[in-house]
């Protein structure tokens, strides 16, 4: 670069030569300065204008122009082929709507290319179209906007767009137009097939077919296709009244065709773009080619090219919103919307809003024409009322933009007179439509003729003068305009009062709504329009802040009346409110049903139109529940969360657990907790489930809804009102109230029996503490104390209550010490009964028939048993039959014992196997009373192998402490006189075990040792022969060894039983329950086993003492009354010896006469503080 040719030096020395054209950087100032100046020059001038300069100016052939031509040749080389020639190329300005683009066009004999010029003389291809698919027209004003020189421009288009092409000169324009028309026609002659079927859909046209398929030639324009479609569809009118739209996958919205386009070229181009139509030869069969356009039906709907015929009026409105023109118009409205009406004259004939329809019944009509007797139309009043209710609670109201499609649909409905439910619309859509309605009022609502006067208002001195001037101007407006302004500024004032929440101050509202209220005339300049717009905004702000002084104070009350009236009209039948919430709806529906509810007036004030989120939260603070929920509130101690095991139990029939009625009553009656010594809610008196009830109760409430103390505030507030609701919707509460009165009457009798009740040996059953022996027995249901969960009850036992559970749930207020114990050890099966009562019911509503039957039956049982002894109050209707079965079973047990005396050693050897087999094979008659337990004991002196000891051990583990030994036919004459020292030792060591209560361990050892059995007294004939002896099984065994030998020898003389009795004993196996291991009885009996072996070795092993034990009543049977009888009795026939020293025998021929009866085993009276047991004759019971 340092050495330069003379020619380059001369060119560089020319002072007027532009460096951009020569490309030289050598000007005056040295090489570094010249290079720097070139860079600055390129920065000042944009790249497109620089290249356009080079393209339009004729320059001498220099190195730069040569390089540019090289770049063009390099670009064109990719399009050139043997049959394609370049006809012309040159720069052009393409305009579409408000958008202008600089392009460089290349026209070939069959192809049209549009490229974008880059700053480095390169081209970027933007469009490449076949000439057969192109069209030209002269309707420049319909395609482009703004000032367009028609002498240098024409319309150029291809699927599916139209542009206004402007050239540098009219000569260039004519040259391009002639070449395009000529070669487009030549290419169309090459099209094959010349015609294709085209499906035309009719939309918004009544009384015509939905679509028709017509045959379209490749040279038919859109206008010609409209004429053919009208004839095929049977529509009268000219093609000017209708417009053809095309919906293709290239553009998101349907595109309107002006009339000069070729529908044939649009559809064929679409097929080529989808690559479904291959290039066919002209010699192919015509029918196959005609079927190719039908491949369009195989495309997805979004890819199909559809042609739609619409009326011109609706098409015009659709064009403003959905066509490609919409984008550019919206862009302009956002930038300089304040100057629309005065910026250019060509926009005056178009609607101001891009979504406004053509003038109809509402929009675009002056207010005096649509207001009858100066009353606003109902749609306008509805929108104002809706905005007055929801606007103050909406952030950014009148500022945030709305969905344009929703706005257009709402406007079309309002403009056509269709009734609209505004509750289904967004509040932003309604605000946008209201502003659009204001913008479409001819000459504005403030009147454009008074524009100068309105602008000068803010130039007044003080506020009073401004107000007076405004009022004078308002008097000059039509009355309908003033009425509308009163409502409008009342709404704006209400929104401004809540500006802290919605962030819309008077200034913000004025900026958003001022352009829709007043705009400058068309003759104003942009500078004046900008200044006037600011003054109009200040004027609207002043009107909002002083609307009460300008329009009067009554505008506030007027809006209030509108709000209430709208609520009454829309609340009953509106079901599509957007803030739809299931909990909210159910709450308000319940309040609407209860016209006399305490909060019903609140619901009347908060109508359907005012269902904002704040109103939802306000109503949820009341937290009112349906009437059924009140029963759940009072039943707060129920454990509503059930485990899977408990849920399985609840599937039993309801009649198996009627105890839930009593438990429900105790929980419903909150007042009785108050009468308790410790007051309500004492932690030591409430079961474990009571603390979780409040948490479980509200499990269906929404997390957003606040919760209040419903036991204190809400119950005290609503209890009086919901008393009558309980009578018609909650059967539990009604039936429980009747039982409350009944139990109050029987409460003195319960208090009288309190002492006897405390002495009961059975205080409840604890399923979790049952031993292994009882679990085995439970499987066969003979002594199954847990049978309530596995076997349904019979008809004679509908009540499932143990004494402990009954006392803990109802009588905890009688005795505080016992109350604490009972509540602390609440039986689990009672909790199961509570849960099962709510298994198949919603809320607290039970099955009315079942519960009514249960309560009626329980009342009858109570009334019958109150007249009897208090300890016998729990017996049911079938007691006589039940005791007869016991008598017969007792006799059978005695007969089996007689057979065991004959089989002595054999029975002893098979005793272990018998214990196992009896659990599997049960006598059928024993299943009649599954809750009772039966056990038979062999004599302690008949089994050398110790089977009698194991039998006695298991028997004494099954029976309770209330055992009565009575004589039988085969009773052993064992002496029952014991030494005082041995008696004290045995009782002190054995009577402390809780296992003495067979199958029913108490909650604690203290409870197990604090009960006494009540025995009936015998007849006068037997009393002289009876005497009471405190007896324990282990003590009885040890003392009986003394007389065992003599008794067995004398028994040999008696005749043996027949052999057939032996067979009967084998057919009817005895139930020998297993004894719980590890109990004190087992230890003591084990010690006495050796002594028994010695006695057996000495004496005869064929004689035995028949021991028969059975439990006459189950704990579940006795639970129907407040008392529990002895669960089982042990009868023992014995013949007492007159003296241990003499060794004589006391003969007994009749076992029922003269045989003394042993008494039940019990604890030491000194330890338990319980009265000694009384003697009763067992025969009297039977």
Swiss-Prot record:
InterPro entries under this entry?
ARHGAP20-like_RhoGAP, ARHGAP20_PH, ARHGAP20_RA, PH-like_dom_sf, PH_domain, RA_dom, Rho_GTPase_activation_prot, RhoGAP_dom
> What tissue expression does the UniProt record report for this protein?
Highest expression is found in testis. Ubiquitously expressed in extragonadal tissues.
Give one GO term, molecular function aspect.
GTPase activator activity
The record describes the protein's role as: GTPase activator for the Rho-type GTPases by converting them to an inactive GDP-bound state.
The record ties this protein, via Pfam families, to:
RA, RHG20_PH, RhoGAP
Q: Which residues carry this modification: Phosphoserine?
A: 46, 704, 730
Site Arginine finger: which residues? 399
Q: What keywords were assigned to this record?
A: GTPase activation, Phosphoprotein
Know the name of this protein?
Rho GTPase-activating protein 20
Q: Locate the Ras-associating domain: which residues?
A: 194-283
The PH domain, residue ranges:
86-187
- Where do Low complexity bias regions lie? 933-953
Which Gene Ontology terms describe the biological processes this protein takes part in? regulation of Rho protein signal transduction; signal transduction
Show where the Rho-GAP domain sits: 365-551
Q: Point to the regions of Polar residues compositional bias.
A: 757-775
> PANTHER family of this UniProt entry?
RHO GTPASE-ACTIVATING PROTEIN 20, T-CELL ACTIVATION RHO GTPASE ACTIVATING PROTEIN-RELATED
Gene assigned in the entry: Arhgap20
Q: Where is this region: Disordered?
A: 1-40, 744-791, 932-953, 981-1009, 1140-1182
């Amino acid at each position: 670069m340092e050495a330069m040719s003379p020619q380059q030096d001369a060119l560089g020395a020319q002072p007027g030569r532009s460096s951009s054209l020569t490309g030289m950087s050598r000007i005056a100032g040295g090489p570094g300065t010249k290079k720097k100046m070139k860079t600055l020059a390129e920065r000042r001038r944009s790249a497109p204008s620089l290249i356009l300069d080079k393209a339009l100016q004729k320059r001498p052939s220099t190195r730069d122009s040569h390089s540019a031509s090289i770049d063009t040749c390099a670009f064109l080389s990719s399009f050139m082929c043997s049959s394609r020639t370049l006809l012309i190329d040159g720069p052009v300005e393409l305009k579409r709507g408000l958008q202008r683009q600089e392009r460089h066009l290349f026209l070939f004999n069959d192809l049209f290319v549009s490229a974008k010029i880059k700053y480095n003389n390169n081209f970027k291809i933007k469009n490449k179209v076949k000439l057969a698919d192109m069209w030209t027209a002269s309707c420049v004003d319909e395609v482009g906007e703004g000032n367009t020189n028609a002498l240098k421009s024409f319309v150029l288009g291809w699927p599916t767009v139209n542009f206004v092409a402007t050239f540098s000169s009219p000569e260039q324009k004519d040259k391009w137009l002639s070449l395009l028309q000529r070669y487009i026609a030549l290419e169309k002659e090459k099209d094959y097939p010349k015609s294709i079927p085209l499906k035309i859909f009719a939309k918004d046209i009544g009384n015509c077919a939905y679509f028709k398929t017509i045959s379209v030639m490749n040279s038919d324009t859109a206008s010609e296709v409209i004429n053919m479609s009208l004839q095929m569809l049977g529509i009268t009118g000219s093609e000017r009244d209708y417009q053809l739209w095309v919906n293709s996958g290239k553009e998101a919205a349907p595109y309107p065709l002006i009339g000069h386009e070729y529908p044939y070229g649009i559809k064929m181009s679409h097929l080529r773009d989808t690559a479904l139509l291959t290039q066919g030869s002209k010699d192919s069969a015509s029918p196959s080619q005609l079927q190719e356009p039908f491949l369009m039906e195989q495309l997805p709907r979004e890819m199909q090219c559809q042609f739609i015929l619409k009326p011109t009026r609706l098409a015009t409105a659709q064009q403003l919103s959905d066509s490609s023109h919409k984008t550019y118009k919206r862009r302009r409205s956002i930038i300089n919307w304040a100057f629309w009406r005065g910026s250019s004259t060509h926009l005056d004939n178009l609607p101001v809003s891009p979504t406004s329809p053509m003038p109809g019944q509402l929009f675009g009509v002056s207010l005096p024409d649509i207001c009858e007797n100066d009353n606003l139309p109902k749609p306008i009043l509805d929108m104002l009322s809706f905005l007055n209710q929801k606007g103050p609670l909406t952030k950014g109201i009148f500022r945030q933009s709305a969905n344009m499609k929703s706005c257009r649909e709402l406007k079309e409905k309002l403009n056509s007179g269709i009734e609209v439910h505004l509750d289904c619309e967004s509040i932003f859509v309604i605000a946008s439509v209201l502003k659009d309605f204001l913008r479409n009022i001819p000459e504005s609502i403030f009147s454009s003729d008074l524009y100068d006067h309105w602008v000068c208002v803010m130039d007044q001195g003080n506020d009073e003068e401004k107000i007076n001037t405004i009022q004078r101007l308002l008097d000059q407006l039509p009355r309908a305009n003033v009425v509308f302004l009163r409502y409008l500024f009342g709404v704006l004032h209400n929104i401004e009062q809540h500006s802290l929440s919605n962030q819309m101050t008077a200034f913000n509202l004025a900026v958003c709504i001022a352009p829709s209220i007043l705009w400058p005339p068309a003759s104003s300049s942009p500078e004046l329009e900008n200044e006037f717009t600011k003054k109009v905004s200040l004027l609207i702000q002043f009107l909002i802040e002083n609307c009460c002084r300008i329009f009067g104070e009554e505008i506030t009350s007027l809006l209030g009346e509108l709000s209430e009236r709208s609520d009454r009209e829309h609340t009953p039948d509106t079901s599509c409110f957007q803030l739809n919430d299931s909990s909210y709806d159910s709450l308000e529906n319940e309040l609407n049903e209860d016209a006399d509810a305490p909060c019903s007036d609140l619901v009347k004030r908060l109508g359907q139109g005012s269902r904002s989120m704040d109103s939802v939260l306000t109503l949820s603070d009341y937290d009112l529940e349906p009437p059924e929920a009140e029963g759940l509130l009072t039943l707060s101690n129920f454990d509503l969360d059930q485990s899977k095991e408990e849920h399985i139990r609840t599937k039993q029939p309801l009649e198996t657990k009627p105890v839930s009625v009593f438990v429900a009553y105790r929980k419903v009656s909150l007042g009785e907790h108050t009468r308790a010594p410790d007051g309500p809610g004492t932690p030591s008196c409430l079961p474990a489930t009571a603390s979780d009830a409040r948490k479980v109760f509200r499990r269906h409430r929404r997390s957003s809804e606040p919760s209040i103390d419903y036991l204190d505030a809400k119950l005290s507030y609503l209890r009086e009102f919901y008393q009558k609701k309980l009578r018609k919707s909650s059967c539990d509460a009604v039936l429980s109230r009747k039982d409350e009165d009944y139990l109050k009457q029987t409460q003195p009798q319960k208090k009288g029996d309190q002492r006897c009740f405390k002495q009961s040996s059975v205080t409840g059953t604890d399923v979790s503490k049952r031993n292994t022996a009882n679990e085995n027995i439970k499987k066969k249901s003979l002594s199954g104390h847990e049978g309530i969960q596995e076997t349904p009850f019979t008809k004679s036992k509908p009540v499932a209550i143990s004494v402990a559970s009954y006392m803990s749930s109802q009588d905890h207020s009688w005795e505080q010490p016992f109350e604490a114990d009972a509540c602390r050890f609440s039986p689990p099966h009672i909790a199961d009964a509570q849960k099962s009562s709510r298994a198949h019911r919603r809320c607290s509503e039970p099955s009315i028939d079942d519960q009514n039957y249960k309560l009626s039956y329980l009342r009858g049982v109570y009334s019958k048993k109150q007249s009897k002894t208090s300890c016998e109050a729990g017996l049911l209707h079938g007691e006589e039959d039940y005791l007869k079965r016991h008598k017969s079973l007792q006799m059978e047990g005695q007969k089996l014992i007689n057979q065991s005396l004959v089989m002595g050693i054999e029975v002893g050897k098979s005793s272990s196997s018998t214990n196992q087999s009896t659990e599997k094979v049960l006598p059928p008659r024993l299943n009649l009373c599954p809750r009772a337990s039966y056990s038979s004991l062999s004599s302690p002196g008949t089994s050398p192998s110790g089977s009698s000891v194991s039998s006695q051990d298991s028997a004494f583990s099954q029976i309770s402490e209330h055992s009565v030994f009575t004589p039988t036919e085969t009773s052993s004459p064992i002496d029952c006189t014991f030494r005082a020292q041995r008696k004290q030792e045995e009782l002190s060591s054995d009577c402390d075990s809780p296992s003495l209560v067979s199958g029913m361990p108490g909650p604690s050892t203290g409870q197990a040792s604090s009960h006494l059995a009540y025995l009936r007294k015998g007849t006068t004939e037997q009393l002289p022969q009876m005497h009471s002896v405190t007896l324990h099984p282990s003590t009885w065994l040890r003392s009986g060894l003394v007389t065992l030998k003599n008794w067995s020898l004398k028994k040999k003389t008696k005749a043996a039983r027949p052999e057939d009795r032996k067979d009967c004993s084998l057919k009817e196996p005895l139930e020998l329950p297993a004894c719980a291991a590890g109990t004190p009885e087992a230890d003591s009996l084990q010690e006495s086993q050796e002594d028994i072996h010695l006695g057996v070795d000495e004496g005869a092993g064929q004689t035995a003492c028949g021991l028969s034990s059975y439990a006459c009543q189950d704990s579940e049977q006795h639970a129907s009354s407040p008392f529990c009888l002895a669960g089982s009795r042990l009868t023992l026939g014995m013949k007492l010896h007159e003296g241990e020293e003499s060794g004589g025998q006391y003969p007994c021929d009749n076992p029922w006469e003269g045989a003394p009866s042993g008494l039940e085993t019990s604890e030491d009276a000194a330890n338990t503080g319980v009265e000694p047991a009384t003697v009763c004759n067992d025969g009297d019971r039977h």
